[in-house]
Amino acid sequence: MDKSLLGKLRKETGFGFSKCREALVLARNDYAAAEAWLHEQAEKEGWQKANKLQGRSATEGLIGVIVNHSDMNLGAMVEVNCETDFVARNENFVDLVNTVTSTTLAYRRGIIQRNQKLNMFGDQVTHLREFILTHELSNLRVEHNNPDSMLLSDMVAKVIGKLGENIKLGKAITITTDSDNVIGSYVHGPYVTKVHQCSFGKYGAMVAVKPIKKGIDTSSLALLANKLAQHVVGMNPKVIGQGGEADEKGGESEALLDQEYLLDGSLTVGQFTEKEGVQVVDFVRYECGAK
């Protein structure tokens, strides 16, 4: 057995020493064949483990958020759960959450593009939010245009096979807004990280805003939306509200616009948005493990 191949296989696949050694022995040092065998075994053993572990509590994990402004104003946020903080920090788990989030975004983009071709939205995409149910999420393909691509449920099983904990796909939502608006995002937690365009944390939020005065460039609008998303994570509002209705309650209000602004206590959120010339169109907040 080639020891250099063993080291490379362990590093690139994340599998243990004994599994990688077994793969290389069976494949007679054919690296590609050994890697393929490992992934087949991981999926097979993962489904077996998943069936055994499915009753175990999984309330830890990560929130993943991606916002894309390049071709359309589109954001996706998902929750993926595991049993322990230790696994939530594992590279394989983080990669899984990244894949689930980016797949959710691609799924929504594909629907919008198909509807645009059918002229269902005319020339403009109006503001939409869509909750994706767990069973729908499980049946999404990593490459949504490829019918032979792996299902997200199979990918979850593979990671269960590697990490040995119960892992569950949780909530998922997408927000789409028209070209004049911008979606901002924010994540928070004890180990916030980022992979490619995806940000991860224990808490996450997306906020869609629209300009109500001229002269606000897109980058400034995005910065304002990100600040408002930070407020949403920290203060947990339930509704947007009308603004000016309960200023005396300050931070006690559940209406976003009536809350004391997290980054400037001299203003309510409503006063801040009026001052900056923006209007909150929509927001959504996720907390990992929350009902």
Curated annotation (Swiss-Prot):
Which keywords does this Swiss-Prot/TrEMBL entry list? Answer: Elongation factor, Mitochondrion, Protein biosynthesis
The family annotation for this protein states: Belongs to the EF-Ts family.
Residue ranges of the TM segments? none
The record's Gene3D superfamilies line, in alphabetical order, gives: DNA helicase RuvA subunit, C-terminal domain, Elongation factor Ts, dimerisation domain
Q: Name one GO biological process term.
A: mitochondrial translational elongation
Give the organism the record lists.
Nematostella vectensis
One further remark on this entry is: This protein may be expected to contain an N-terminal transit peptide but none has been predicted.
Put simply, this protein is called Elongation factor Ts, mitochondrial
Can you provide one Gene Ontology molecular function annotated for this UniProt record? translation elongation factor activity
* Pfam families the record matches: EF-Ts_N, EF_TS
Location relative to the cell? Mitochondrion
Keyword Protein biosynthesis on this protein?
Answer: yes
